[in-house]
Regions:
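Metal-associated gating/positioning segment near the N- to mid-region
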Residues: 48-128, 132
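Divalent metal-coordination and catalytic microenvironments
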Residues: 9, 22, 27, 50, ...
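Histidine/acidic residue-rich metal-binding segments in metalloenzymes
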Residues: 149-325, 341
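His/Asp/Glu-enriched, well-ordered alpha-helical/loop segment
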Residues: 217-249, 318-319, 323-324, 330-411
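C-terminal cap of metal-dependent C-N hydrolases
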Residues: 338-343, 398-464
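Alpha-helix-loop-beta-strand connector modules within alpha/beta enzyme cores
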Residues: 118-135, 185-197
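Histidine-rich, glycine-flanked metal-binding segment
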Residues: 1-56, 70-74
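Active-site mouth loops of central-metabolism enzymes
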Residues: 60-81, 138-151, 170, 225-226
Length: 478
């Protein structure tokens, strides 16, 4: 007997879209068959008529249970929302797996932990999430500053343990010098991992910050002048050149400028394994919105830029230059988010893990800009492939985890704070009119959200070991 059968829906599979029924047993998809052809009995049967049946969303970029910089928060001791709250919001938004951070990024650890091994630090971070997540989760490991040689030598062990991606910054206090980057890239590339890179030119950012302060133009609405287009252009291309030299795959987090997208396109045209991520607020807002009342609530670092950049990012998502959509989830309350009002003190991030799927669907699928298959690629499958979860995650296929979202393309819904599920008191998407919305979320065969009602438990989520396929690291596979 099957544990669960889903019938009547329009299913997006790796081989295309069709009218299929799905059989689930022991947390796995065991049958994907033509409509009405599954004759096995099931404990639970779900009628998905009129719905898309999609792989569960994968959020590749979150900052959960992270200490907020005192410069941003205006006071010490502030944390972003807990794993329980963030994963609850994720589940309601059709997301079944998210990737957070362990290691040297500011706020993910208490004090300097660089004398401890990568595995010890991973275990400590995992203990914060285990038993407290409605959905599955994994970690990128952040390498910050002048990374000790002994830490670089531990990268191979971390990859073997299931941590396949390593985050670095080229600016801010976590900046890694390029000599150390060279060694890190070689170690990650030789171990079969992939780099996740926040790329800006640190000299340019610092120069522009000082210039804007000197000229009295350091208001938060000028963030795009400090974290600017040419900085992204130069930094992306330097990282790509280093990755080419070391034969290392690159995943650029939060591409913000058209120049960043052009750099990624140039690399991919050379068949380099370079991938880019788009945040859904970057696909919608421009820096002009910073000037509105409470306008910096939309901000995520580096900076939201010009209308031409927003349009360029949209086109890059449509044409496949950018492979994934993400949130850079960083949920606080409104007083924290708006505490700082200068280019150095505006708080980054927002509570977007629940809104990503319906916003992206509304902007791109309901308008005919991309197909439903492309939507699945950018919200689930590509992240699974690039970051080492495919085909366990990101696919409705025999043998895959039964992570599934039922998405109603005919549901017209206005996003309101009252109907969101994060621990926060604001949403930058308040009033956004959605054409299509996730209604039911299934994690490894268990219904955790049923027609908008939470059914799961914060003990449902598991840590996920990952391994990037060699094909992803050889050429741009997706």
């Amino acid at each position: 007997m099957l544990d669960l059968k889903i019938h009547g829906g329009t299913v997006v599979t790796p081989s295309g879209v069709g009218q299929f029924d799905i059989g689930i047993q022991d947390e796995k998809i065991v049958l994907v068959a033509a409509r009405n052809s599954i004759i096995d009995e099931s404990q639970i049967s779900i009628d998905a008529s009129g719905k898309y049946v999609l792989p569960g969303g994968i959020e590749p970029h979150t900052h959960i249970a992270t200490r907020v910089s005192e410069d941003w928060a205006g006071r010490p001791g502030v944390m972003t929302q807990s794993p329980e709250a963030a994963s609850r919001a994720a589940a309601h938004g059709g997301v079944t797996t998210y990737i957070d951070f362990a290691g040297g990024m500011e706020g993910t650890e208490e004090g300097d932990q660089s004398d401890k091994s990568i595995m010890t630090r991973l275990d400590a971070r995992r203990s914060v999430f285990s038993g407290h997540s409605y959905t599955d989760f994994a970690f990128h490991f952040t390498l910050a500053g002048e990374v000790p040689t002994r830490t670089i030598e531990e990268i191979g062990e971390a990859v073997q343990s299931g941590v396949s991606s390593f985050k670095i910054f080229t600016t801010f206090g976590s900046k890694v010098p390029y000599g150390h980057l060279w060694a890190i890239f070689e170690a990650v590339g030789n171990s079969g991992g992939i780099m996740a890179v926040h790329a800006e030119d640190d000299d340019m950012v610092k120069y522009m910050e000082a210039k804007l302060i000197r000229e009295g133009r350091d208001q938060g609405y000028n963030l795009h002048l400090a974290h600017n287009n040419i900085s992204e252009d130069i930094s992306f291309r330097k990282i790509i050149r280093l990755s080419e030299h070391t034969e290392t795959g690159i995943y650029f987090v939060h591409t913000t400028a058209k120049e960043g997208a052009y750099a990624i396109a140039d690399a991919r045209n050379k068949q380099l394994p370079v991938y880019g991520e788009a945040l859904h607020n970057y696909l919608h807002f421009t820096h002009d919105h910073y000037r509105e009342p409470e306008g910096t609530a939309i901000h995520t670092y580096p900076a939201i830029k010009h209308a031409s950049d927003r349009d360029g990012l949209q086109e890059a998502l449509i044409n496949g230059t950018l492979s994934t959509t993400a949130t850079d989830e960083y949920t606080t309350y409104k007083d924290i988010k708006l505490s700082g009002n200068t280019i150095e003190t505006v708080c980054g991030g927002h509570n977007g893990i629940e809104t990503r799927l319906p916003v992206v669907y509304t902007k791109f699928v309901s308008t005919g800009l991309i197909s439903i298959e492309h939507f699945v690629d950018t919200t689930s499958t590509n992240a699974a492939k690039i970051l080492g979860m495919y085909p366990q995650k990101g696919a409705i296929a025999t043998g895959s985890d039964a992570d599934i979202v039922l998405f109603d393309p005919d549901m017209n819904k206005t996003i309101t704070l009252d109907e969101l599920h994060a621990d926060s008191d604001y949403s930058i998407w308040e009033g956004f009119e959605c054409q299509g919305y996730p209604v039911t979320t299934i994690l490894r065969g268990k219904v955790i959200v049923d027609n908008g009602e939470l059914k799961g438990s914060p003990t449902d989520g598991n840590w996920l070991a990952r391994k990037v396929a060699p094909s992803v690291l050889a050429n741009p596979e997706c």
